[in-house]
Amino acid sequence: MGVWLSKDDYIRDLKRIILCFLIVYMAILVGTEQDFYSLLGVSKTASSREIRQAFKKLALKLHPDKNPNNPNAHGNFLKINRAYEVLKDEDLRKKYDKYGEKGLEDNQGGQYESWNYYRYDFGIYDDDPEIITLERREFDAAVNSGELWFVNFYSPGCSHCHDLAPTWRDFAKEVDGLLRIGAVNCGDDRMLCRMKGVNSYPSLFIFRSGMAPVKYHGDRSKESLVSFAMQHVRSTVTELWTGNFVNSIQTAFAAGIGWLITFCSKGGDCLTSQTRLRLSGMLDGLVNVGWMDCATQDNLCKSLDITTSTTAYFPPGATLNNKEKNSILFLNSLDAKEIYLEVIHNLPDFELLSAHTLEDRLAHHRWLLFFHFGKNENSNDPELKKLKTLLKNDHIQVGRFDCSSAPDICSNLYVFQPSLAVFKGQGTKEYEIHHGKKILYDILAFAKESVNSHVTTLGPQNFPANDKEPWLVDFFAPWCPPCRALLPELRRASNLLYGQLKFGTLDCTVHEGLCNMYNIQAYPTTVVFNQSNIHEYEGHHSAEQILEFIEDLMNPSVVSLTPTTFNELVTQRKHNEVWMVDFYSPWCHPCQVLMPEWKRMARTLTGLINVGSIDCQQYHSFCAQENVQRYPEIRFFPPKSNKAYQYHSYNGWNRDAYSLRIWGLGFLPQVSTGLTPQTFSEKVLQGKNHWVIDFYAPWCGPCQNFAPEFELLARMIKGKVKAGKVDCQAYAQTCQKAGIRAYPTVKFYFYESAKRTFQEEQINIRDAKAIAALINEKLETLQNQGKRNKDEL
């Protein structure tokens, strides 16, 4: 017998069925999308190096060249190649972590190299522990850490780079501990290599904080590389004798520095001069290195009970003629690296701060503090003992604190595992926990940046939810590589915005409740709190773009439109006004990716094109009325004419600020003047006006890209300088006479009224603002010269 359901029961059951269907559908959908991390067999915490190594291993196994009989080989390889292309890129990795593959619709990729490339050219130095592969985000911090770096800029396809690789590996092992050996893959980091002036491969440079980079021009043998490197190593070896021995020892001991002395006698072996120099460089600032010739200093050696060649380390305060020699370390090795490790292992540990004096000590000095729980884990890395010396000039003291002696103190600082933090001289109120690599150069960079920045570690007690001052808060997880990459940029941004905005970081693995309260679903999520207003940052991980975001919050470059204001400002715009409008929906991932680019574009078009956006989730009916069928929908509204309602839709693949700007400028009426051979001669060469000329060819792609930029320049300098264009395909002879050898070429022709002659100057910049600034500077110089000439008359 059937059972009749009431209307309410029917609706309730129908909702349940629909919900179950949706759950099953989503499970199937999720199951079909393979996780990029799983594809490569790495964890979400994997470093760039680990991702490269995992991809290379898979590439050599799955490449279509090695699987010619597998019809699925191409498709399978595309999947892992796509995963690698996304995860190796910091910005794409952040998008993927936050939105999944939907957030990558503008970055499709799809190309890969041959099997031989992955076997022989890919990740040349990833398996060499002595060589550190540096990426753009960490390069400056590394080479400015205070250590000496020798960096190899190479390209994977360069045969000379591969010829050098075995020598570079041997060289790195030879000088390990003496200086840092780095490598930069210019195939992956083209921008970094261009910024460093690298235009040939391999290029080898010495870097040290406070000095200009030095390029190596010698032959590429290990011996020549070692010789060149040693020229830049700070090494002083003192010959000790009766006249200077006592004073040298006492002066060093008074400064807390010990001596490593090799005694050379007839019997046994003492260290060679080359080994002594290397040890001096390796122990620079930690231990003085000296030698004594016992053949000429026989009495002094006997007084020290030295009867044969030997090497000994005398720590500060050691009794030199103590026959028990309990405090003196005698070394049996003749190898510089072995001696270095033994000496540095015997150096005293950092000062242990007590719970009783901690607050007072941190209130009067800047500190880098290691937190440990009972056993000091840092003693496993003797290299870290260099920190005290390398941070001395920055007035940063280095110490340690045992959390097992006062658990409450560490708990209040949210320190629950061995870690280190910088305290900025204000007690325990202002501090920042280190989340980077536990290696010397990374800790040095962190300490120097942190003490001079204005970023603080946040928790429930100091979270600025209701603070009257605006705050930028970075919600992050320490295991997330894009999060760690963002932290140095936040420090830079905090200095640029000091006094306008406070900066803090919140570790969501420690403060899960706070992160859930603000619905943090991906890391890093950066939010600006301005009393009741909350704004999420969606831009790239750079201090400059964070600065742009804050400036845009204070002075918005994009008009938020409503149906009413759209009608008033866009539909009924003035005759000479133009608009670009973004129709978007907040839930749409491509819209979210577009928004920071849209704002960046708007700032560059101020005064030329009005830029707006309209929320189609809030104003759904209006967007439907405007026939908006997809998001984001970008439209250009040209100057009003007698024609019906008119606009142009953007159909380009790239939605970055540059591409959109070029597209919008292309609709503006031309301000520059097209010149013929006759008008070029009459108006430019024989006239009395300043001119800037774009020499171009219609078939030239870069010329087409530059054309809107030149029109923007023409508008920026209108009234001061005339702008003209010469078609070098139509008027080849004119361009030849003007000395044009490439397209586009920009030249500034300026008229010197005092001499009644024209001068010309080639401009090798392609940015309208930069060209305008250069021209204005030149005009000011000409004006000042004119004034001086009048004064002289």
From Swiss-Prot:
<keyword id="KW-0256">Endoplasmic reticulum</keyword>
<feature type="domain" description="J">
    <location>
        <begin position="35"/>
        <end position="100"/>
    </location>
</feature>
<dbReference type="InterPro" id="IPR017937">
    <property type="entry name" value="Thioredoxin_CS"/>
</dbReference>
<dbReference type="InterPro" id="IPR021170">
    <property type="entry name" value="ERdj5"/>
</dbReference>
<comment type="function">
    <text>Endoplasmic reticulum disulfide reductase involved both in the correct folding of proteins and degradation of misfolded proteins. Required for efficient folding of proteins in the endoplasmic reticulum by catalyzing the removal of non-native disulfide bonds formed during the folding of proteins, such as LDLR. Also involved in endoplasmic reticulum-associated degradation (ERAD) by reducing incorrect disulfide bonds in misfolded glycoproteins recognized by EDEM1.</text>
</comment>
<dbReference type="InterPro" id="IPR036249">
    <property type="entry name" value="Thioredoxin-like_sf"/>
</dbReference>
<protein>
    <recommendedName>
        <fullName>DnaJ homolog subfamily C member 10</fullName>
        <ecNumber>1.8.4.-</ecNumber>
    </recommendedName>
</protein>
<dbReference type="GO" id="GO:0034975">
    <property type="term" value="P:protein folding in endoplasmic reticulum"/>
</dbReference>
<keyword id="KW-0732">Signal</keyword>
<dbReference type="GO" id="GO:0015035">
    <property type="term" value="F:protein-disulfide reductase activity"/>
</dbReference>
<keyword id="KW-0677">Repeat</keyword>
<feature type="glycosylation site" description="N-linked (GlcNAc...) asparagine">
    <location>
        <position position="530"/>
    </location>
</feature>
<dbReference type="InterPro" id="IPR013766">
    <property type="entry name" value="Thioredoxin_domain"/>
</dbReference>
<feature type="domain" description="Thioredoxin 4">
    <location>
        <begin position="671"/>
        <end position="778"/>
    </location>
</feature>
<feature type="domain" description="Thioredoxin 3">
    <location>
        <begin position="557"/>
        <end position="662"/>
    </location>
</feature>
<feature type="region of interest" description="Trxb 2">
    <location>
        <begin position="348"/>
        <end position="463"/>
    </location>
</feature>
<dbReference type="InterPro" id="IPR052460">
    <property type="entry name" value="ER_disulfide_reductase"/>
</dbReference>
<feature type="region of interest" description="Trxb 1">
    <location>
        <begin position="235"/>
        <end position="350"/>
    </location>
</feature>
<dbReference type="InterPro" id="IPR035674">
    <property type="entry name" value="ERdj5_TRX_C"/>
</dbReference>
<feature type="disulfide bond" description="Redox-active">
    <location>
        <begin position="480"/>
        <end position="483"/>
    </location>
</feature>
<feature type="domain" description="Thioredoxin 2">
    <location>
        <begin position="454"/>
        <end position="553"/>
    </location>
</feature>
<dbReference type="GO" id="GO:0016671">
    <property type="term" value="F:oxidoreductase activity, acting on a sulfur group of donors, disulfide as acceptor"/>
</dbReference>
<feature type="domain" description="Thioredoxin 1">
    <location>
        <begin position="130"/>
        <end position="232"/>
    </location>
</feature>
<dbReference type="InterPro" id="IPR001623">
    <property type="entry name" value="DnaJ_domain"/>
</dbReference>
<dbReference type="InterPro" id="IPR036869">
    <property type="entry name" value="J_dom_sf"/>
</dbReference>
<dbReference type="Pfam" id="PF00085">
    <property type="entry name" value="Thioredoxin"/>
</dbReference>
<keyword id="KW-0560">Oxidoreductase</keyword>
<dbReference type="GO" id="GO:0036498">
    <property type="term" value="P:IRE1-mediated unfolded protein response"/>
</dbReference>
<dbReference type="GO" id="GO:0051787">
    <property type="term" value="F:misfolded protein binding"/>
</dbReference>
<dbReference type="Pfam" id="PF00226">
    <property type="entry name" value="DnaJ"/>
</dbReference>
<keyword id="KW-0325">Glycoprotein</keyword>
<comment type="subunit">
    <text>Interacts with HSPA5 (via its J domain). Interacts with EDEM1.</text>
</comment>
<feature type="disulfide bond" description="Redox-active">
    <location>
        <begin position="158"/>
        <end position="161"/>
    </location>
</feature>
<feature type="disulfide bond" description="Redox-active">
    <location>
        <begin position="700"/>
        <end position="703"/>
    </location>
</feature>
<dbReference type="InterPro" id="IPR035673">
    <property type="entry name" value="ERdj5_TRX_N"/>
</dbReference>
<keyword id="KW-1015">Disulfide bond</keyword>
<feature type="signal peptide">
    <location>
        <begin position="1"/>
        <end position="32"/>
    </location>
</feature>
<dbReference type="GO" id="GO:0036503">
    <property type="term" value="P:ERAD pathway"/>
</dbReference>
<feature type="disulfide bond" description="Redox-active">
    <location>
        <begin position="588"/>
        <end position="591"/>
    </location>
</feature>
<feature type="short sequence motif" description="Prevents secretion from ER">
    <location>
        <begin position="790"/>
        <end position="793"/>
    </location>
</feature>
<keyword id="KW-0676">Redox-active center</keyword>
<dbReference type="GO" id="GO:0005788">
    <property type="term" value="C:endoplasmic reticulum lumen"/>
</dbReference>
